[in-house]
């Protein structure tokens, strides 16, 4: 402790000194705990009222929700955009108040200052004081092979998240910035929990997560299938099990379809993931808004040679210029694609048909891998709001006993069973709620409960 303080005091920037001192004290409290520390009182279940601040820190954004865990009610939510390049915060309360303003946010710490002000001051005020925030839960995209469940933040956890940045450079670096900014903004008495998108997929067997490249690349660099959208797949699959009357998951076979601008399909047996479409990165799987999905690896090297592209340029092409956008030439937004299809745009039709065909192949393969399927789940922006795509998928599997209820399938963003009562396989639209999963995990961990 003394050596740390001496080192810090040599730094001339006062702000850095304060941050480092807070951080050191925070880590000591996390490691040892004290009877009078409110954070540890939370963890011991001594708090009756609990409000959780859920954070999703991106490279230039910070999304948040404040959730009152008594009734699991969202008190307010918002988004800080264009961090480092100007700034805008949009803050919405549960009773309909909306506050939007341009404000300079040069880093995530400045963004947190705006979040604090939005929650406690002015027209968007929902709490009287920051002391009402019991804990903070962070969404983390990449947790590697190490994390198969959510954990309390400590020094090693932060370092591990930073170390996995090579597998998710745009995300994990921002997550670390978000955690450190939260420590600065809320002090050391507010415990923090991290919830990993990859954790739910850690039950996959090696035959599903290994790639057919030399084994040493797995040993040396962690090259394997990790899967993403795990928090979403976890929420909707657990909700589906409740609807099936089998909350423990035993004897069940589910296929969860998270369709958004980024999309993935996951096979779940007995409540545990056995396979998923995304791989080392969120680029794998079927064609998405601007992502290529799986392609012959030789296509990559061939284009690089022909175009003289660097690895970074090729990565940008596959992630930002491909998929529905690249094929249609119209947009990466599914609503624009649907409108273009309706207007007779042939390339938009091709993009639509390619994606649908690829999805159907994955679902069919997962039915075989599961040895059958009890229920199909549709979630996320497209899955919850695109009846035509859902209908096309279900009709394809009529031979397997899926029967679409045309009227119920017209639903947008509302939990609904969209198959008929005599369908041998049930299909549901289940709106996802990743923030609630993060809040629930955060509450459980600081109360000392097992996940």
Show which residues each predicted segment covers.
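Adenine-nucleotide phosphate-binding core of ATP-dependent small-molecule kinases
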Residues: 323-327, 334-369
């Amino acid at each position: 402790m003394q050596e740390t303080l001496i080192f810090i005091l040599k730094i001339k920037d006062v702000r850095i000194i304060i941050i480092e001192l807070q951080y050191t004290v925070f880590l000591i409290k996390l490691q040892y705990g004290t009877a009078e520390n409110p954070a540890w009182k939370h963890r011991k279940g001594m708090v009756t009222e609990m409000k959780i601040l859920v954070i999703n820190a991106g490279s230039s954004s910070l999304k948040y929700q404040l959730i009152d865990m008594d009734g699991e009610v969202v008190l307010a939510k918002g988004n800080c955009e264009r961090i480092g390049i100007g700034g805008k915060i949009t803050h919405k309360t549960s009773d309909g108040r909306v506050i939007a303003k341009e404000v300079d946010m040069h880093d995530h710490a400045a963004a947190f200052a705006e979040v604090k002000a939005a929650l406690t001051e002015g027209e968007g005020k929902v709490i009287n004081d920051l002391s009402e925030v019991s804990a903070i839960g962070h969404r983390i995209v990449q947790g590697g092979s190490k994390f198969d469940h959510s954990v309390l933040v400590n020094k090693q956890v932060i370092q591990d998240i930073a170390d996995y940045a090579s597998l998710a450079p745009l995300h994990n670096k921002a997550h670390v910035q978000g955690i450190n900014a939260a420590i600065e903004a809320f002090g050391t008495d507010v415990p923090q929990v991290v919830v990993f998108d990859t954790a739910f997929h850690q039950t996959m067997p090696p035959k599903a997560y290994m790639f057919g490249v030399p084994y040493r690349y797995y040993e040396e660099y962690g090259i394997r299938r990790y899967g993403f959208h795990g928090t979403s797949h976890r929420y909707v699959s657990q909700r589906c099990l409740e609807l099936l009357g089998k909350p423990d998951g035993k004897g069940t076979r589910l296929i969860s379809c998270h369709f958004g601008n980024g999309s993935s399909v996951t096979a779940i047996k007995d409540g545990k993931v056995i396979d998923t479409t995304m791989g080392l990165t969120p680029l794998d799987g079927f064609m998405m808004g601007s992502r290529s999905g799986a392609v012959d690896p030789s296509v990559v090297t061939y284009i690089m040679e022909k175009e003289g592209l660097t690895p970074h340029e090729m990565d940008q092409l596959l992630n930002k210029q491909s998929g529905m956008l690249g094929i249609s030439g119209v947009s990466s937004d599914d609503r624009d694609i649907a409108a273009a299809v309706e207007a007779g745009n042939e390339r938009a039709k091709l993009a639509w048909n390619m994606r649908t065909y690829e999805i159907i192949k994955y679902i069919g393969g997962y039915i075989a891998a599961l040895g059958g399927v009890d229920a199909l789940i549709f979630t996320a922006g497209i899955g919850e709001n695109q009846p035509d795509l859902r209908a096309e998928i279900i009709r394809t599997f009529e031979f397997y006993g899926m029967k679409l209820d045309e009227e119920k399938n017209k639903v947008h963003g509302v939990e609904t069973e969209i198959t008929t009562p005599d369908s041998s396989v049930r299909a549901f639209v289940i709106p996802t709620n990743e923030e609630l999963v993060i809040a629930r995990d955060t509450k459980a961990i600081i109360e000392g409960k097992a996940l």
